[in-house]
Amino acid sequence: RLKSSWLYSFLRKPIPVRTWIKVKMPTFAFSDKEVADLTAYFEAMSPGAEYEASVHVGKDNAIAQKGAAMVTYMDCGRCHDDGDKGIEFSLASQRLRQDWIPKWLKNTRAMIPWTTMPSHWVKDGDNYKVPTKYDEIKTIGDVDTQVNTIKDLIVAYNTAELDFDASLGEEGGDDEGGSDDEGDDEDEDE
């Protein structure tokens, strides 16, 4: 799930990733060759991990902006903005492989059962569906489009100009199907 370039940098100089965990990665006095060998080892142990040639290709800013509106609507920043409970988006952008992000978003608890991150899409047989609580994200498209939109946001997070005050459903819409009362009160006060 990690980019080799990020892993190499991390092994050279560890930084806090999960700030809410009290255990810290020790700093070893690895030589450049040892770090390269360790990175190559982890890469070899990751089946199907290939160099992401497209990692430096810019993402469509409009799609990344839809992702920003989605994570604002879903209140992802409650955990990810300052890294208190979830990894900051700016760090996720640097360390996570693009192909891994949609798998993680759809299968969060199946992939890592002990994670504190909730599963936002409900598995229904072989398909995923949007829970009523987040009904408004259906305006983005089907579940695959939704998770890929968030993936594009994460990948572009450190390079795109994003407005996290933008909202979903600009075309108007009803709150039927799951907006919580807090969101309704905010709309009435505006």
Spans of model-derived segments:
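Electrostatic cytochrome c docking/interface patches
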Residues: 45-72, 162-165, 176
